From Swiss-Prot:
Its main location: cytoplasm. InterPro entries: YbaB-like_sf, YbaB/EbfC. HAMAP family: DNA_YbaB_EbfC. Homodimer. This is Nucleoid-associated protein lwe2654. It is found in: Cytoplasm, Nucleoid. GO terms for cellular component: bacterial nucleoid; cytosol. SUPFAM superfamilies: YbaB-like. Belongs to the YbaB/EbfC family. Keywords: Cytoplasm, DNA-binding.
Amino acid sequence: MRGMGNMQGMMKQMQKMQKEMAKAQADLEVQEFTGTAGGGMVTVKATGKRVITDVVINEEVVDPEDIEMLQDLVLAATNDVLKQIEDTTSQTMGKFTQGLNLPGM
């Protein structure tokens, strides 16, 4: 019967961890991230749900003769913000799986 008490304790611990993970995920989804390129000439903001909420382009980089550079800056700023979201998500959610030795995690 001692094994049953241990199993119940483990189940409670898992349920608690699931709740904490859900809260962490919800917090990440509403967090705002900012990516930049060109020394801040282009800024892209997004939520943790990877929804772009704002794009700001400094007028100094708008050159009708060099649209390609502007496109590259927007792309770089977008990739920067997405990487920040990915890194923060991995770091935050990794705290829950650390030390569990789960296959594939």
